[in-house]
Amino acid sequence: MSSQPSKDLETFENPQPGRDYTIRIRVPEFTCLCPKTGQPDFATLFLDYVPRARCVELKSLKLYVWAFRDQGAFHEKVTNEILNDLVAATDPNFMRLTAEFNVRGGVYTTVVAEHRHPDWQPPVPVTLP
């Protein structure tokens, strides 16, 4: 595997395909460019997903995220693009991507995008006493 930025996402087989479980990934150093000003925008990405057959490989995710450093994109567009690419690579039961962008001009932006597989029924939440 290269150490250059790349839009190629690698995956591996889910080691527990018969169980619903959540994978949580935090990416604190996401950067893209504002398409209006060309200035860098910084964000922390929070990825939560319930895998089906495939899981995303973490080094390829890091290189994928790096590939946005010189790309101009609005926050809403880039968040949904990343979610779409991750869904295409892994076909999860459920995936949520939260992008918390750093302040720009006194405004904080958080974009939350979700995907739910049409055949998946989430488990009933457990309420502890």
UniProtKB/Swiss-Prot annotation:
It is an enzyme of class 1 (oxidoreductase). Its main location: cytoplasm. It catalyses: 7-aminomethyl-7-carbaguanine + 2 NADP(+) = 7-cyano-7-deazaguanine + 2 NADPH + 3 H(+). Its EC number is 1.7.1.13. Pfam families: QueF. Keywords: Cytoplasm, NADP, Oxidoreductase, Queuosine biosynthesis. The active site is at C34 (thioimide intermediate), D41 (proton donor). One of its GO terms (molecular function) is preQ1 synthase activity. Substrate binds at V56, E57, L58, H75, E76. Gene3D superfamilies: 3.30.1130.10. It is found in: Cytoplasm. Pathway: tRNA modification; tRNA-queuosine biosynthesis. GO terms for biological process: queuosine biosynthetic process; tRNA modification. One of its GO terms (cellular component) is cytoplasm. Catalyzes the NADPH-dependent reduction of 7-cyano-7-deazaguanine (preQ0) to 7-aminomethyl-7-deazaguanine (preQ1). Belongs to the GTP cyclohydrolase I family. QueF type 1 subfamily. This is NADPH-dependent 7-cyano-7-deazaguanine reductase. The gene is queF.
